[in-house]
C-alpha cells in the first residue's frame, strides 16, 4: 500500500471513528456509568436481587462499551506511528505487521459501526428466543435443536449469559420447541434480524434410503418486557395448566407437576416454562414470556400499519430468510442480504456475526 493510500485510509478510519463516537455519545455513557456505580455501591443493593442484577449487568455493559471505543481510538492513533516506523526503517516485517493491524482495525470499526445502527425502540433490550420445528418431521426437530445450539454457542462466544426456560423434546430426536433468554443489552436489536423461517437441505440421517430431505424451523425473537411497557394481563383471561417436566425421549425430569403452561384466551398465545425449581417460579417466568409475546404482537401491529402506508410487506414470522444447504453442496445463504458462508459447520457452531451484521445493515437500509 502506497504512503498516500495509507494516509487516506487512516484519515477515513479516524473520520468513521469520530462519527461512531458522536452516535455513542461517550460523555453521556460516562455520566450513566457514574450514576450506576453509585447505585452499585449502595449497601442496600442486594435487598432486591433482580434489580441489583440489572444494575450490575448494565454497568458492566456500559463500561465495556466505553473501553472498547477508547481502545479502538487508541489503535487507530497507533497505526499512524506504526506505518511511520515501517517507512523510516524500510522494514518489511514492520510494514506487514502494520498492514495486518490496519485490516484488524477496519474489521473492528465495521463491527462497532453496526452497533450504532441499533437505534430501534426495543433494540437495547435483552432478548427471548423462541424456536420451533416446522415442516419436515424428525429432520425439522433435529434442525430446531441445531439452531438452539447455534444461538447458545454464539451467546457463549460473546460472553453473554443465557437461560433456557422451556424445551419440548421430540420423540425420536431433536426438539419440538424451545424458549431461552439471551441476557445482554442489545441482544434483541442484534438477534431480531434472525426472525423468520430457516430451511435445511441435507441427506437425512433418519432416512434408511439416504434420501435428500428439506426441513424447516421457525425463529422468533422477542424483546424482554420492562415495567414502562405497561403490558397488563387479566388473570381471568388466562388458562393455567400444570404438568410434569420431561426430558429427551419423554423421560421425566421432575417428580412433581411443577411445569406451567399458560394460554392467553383472547389471542390464543400459548407459553410454557419447566426449568425453574417450583411451580410458582415457572409461572412467573411463563408470564414474562407471555408479556414479551404480547409486546411483540403490539409492535408488529404498529409495524404493519407503517408497512401498509409504505406499501411494504415487512419481515414477518413466516418469511423464509435463510437456507442451510449440506447437500449436494455446502452453503449457508441469507436470502435477503445475499450474505453466504461455505462452511455450515462453523455457522452451526455459532459463527453467525457476518449474518447478523449484514442483516442489521439490510434492515437499516430498508428503513430509509
UniProtKB/Swiss-Prot annotation:
Methylated by PrmC. Methylation increases the termination efficiency of RF2. Its main location: cytoplasm. Keywords: Cytoplasm, Methylation, Protein biosynthesis. GO terms for molecular function: translation release factor activity, codon specific. The keyword Protein transport does not apply. HAMAP family: Rel_fac_2. Peptide chain release factor 2 directs the termination of translation in response to the peptide chain termination codons UGA and UAA. Belongs to the prokaryotic/mitochondrial release factor family. This is Peptide chain release factor 2. It comes from Streptomyces coelicolor (strain ATCC BAA-471 / A3(2) / M145).
Amino acid at each position: 500500500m502506497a504512503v498516500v493510500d495509507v494516509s487516506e485510509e487512516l484519515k477515513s478510519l479516524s473520520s468513521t471513528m469520530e462519527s461512531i463516537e458522536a452516535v455513542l455519545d461517550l460523555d453521556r455513557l460516562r455520566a450513566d456509568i457514574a450514576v450506576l456505580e453509585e447505585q452499585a455501591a449502595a449497601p442496600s443493593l442486594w435487598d432486591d436481587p433482580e434489580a441489583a442484577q440489572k444494575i450490575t449487568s448494565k454497568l458492566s455493559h456500559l463500561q465495556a462499551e466505553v473501553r472498547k471505543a477508547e481502545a479502538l481510538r487508541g489503535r487507530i492513533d497507533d497505526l499512524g506511528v506504526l506505518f511511520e516506523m515501517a517507512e523510516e526503517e524500510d522494514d518489511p516485517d514492520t510494514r506487514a505487521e502494520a498492514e495486518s493491524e490496519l485490516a484488524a482495525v477496519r474489521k473492528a470499526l465495521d463491527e462497532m459501526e453496526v452497533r450504532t445502527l441499533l437505534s430501534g425502540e426495543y433494540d437495547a433490550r435483552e432478548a427471548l428466543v423462541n424456536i420451533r420445528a416446522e415442516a419436515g418431521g424428525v429432520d425439522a426437530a433435529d434442525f430446531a435443536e441445531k439452531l438452539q445450539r447455534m444461538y447458545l454457542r454464539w451467546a457463549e462466544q460473546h460472553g453473554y449469559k443465557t437461560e433456557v426456560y422451556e424445551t419440548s423434546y421430540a420423540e425420536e430426536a431433536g426438539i419440538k420447541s424451545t424458549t431461552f433468554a439471551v441476557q445482554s443489552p442489545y441482544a434483541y436489536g442484534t438477534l431480531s434480524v434472525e426472525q423468520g423461517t430457516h430451511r435445511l437441505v441435507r441427506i437425512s440421517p433418519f432416512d434408511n434410503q439416504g434420501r435428500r430431505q428439506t426441513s424447516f424451523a421457525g425463529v422468533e425473537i422477542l424483546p424482554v418486557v420492562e415495567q414502562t411497557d405497561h403490558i397488563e394481563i387479566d388473570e381471568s383471561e388466562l388458562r393455567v395448566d400444570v404438568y410434569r417436566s420431561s426430558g429427551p425421549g419423554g423421560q421425566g425430569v421432575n417428580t412433581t407437576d411443577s411445569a406451567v403452561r399458560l394460554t392467553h384466551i383472547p389471542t390464543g398465545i400459548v407459553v410454557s416454562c419447566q426449568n425453574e425449581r417450583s411451580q410458582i417460579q415457572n409461572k412467573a417466568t411463563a408470564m414474562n414470556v407471555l408479556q414479551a409475546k404480547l409486546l411483540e404482537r403490539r409492535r408488529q401491529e404498529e409495524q404493519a400499519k407503517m408497512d401498509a402506508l409504505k406499501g411494504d410487506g415487512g419481515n414477518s414470522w413466516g418469511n423464509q430468510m435463510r437456507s442451510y444447504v449440506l447437500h449436494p453442496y455446502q452453503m449457508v445463504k441469507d436470502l435477503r442480504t445475499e450474505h453466504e458462508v461455505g462452511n455450515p459447520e462453523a455457522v452451526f457452531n455459532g459463527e453467525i456475526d457476518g449474518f447478523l451484521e449484514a442483516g442489521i445493515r439490510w434492515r437499516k437500509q430498508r428503513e430509509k
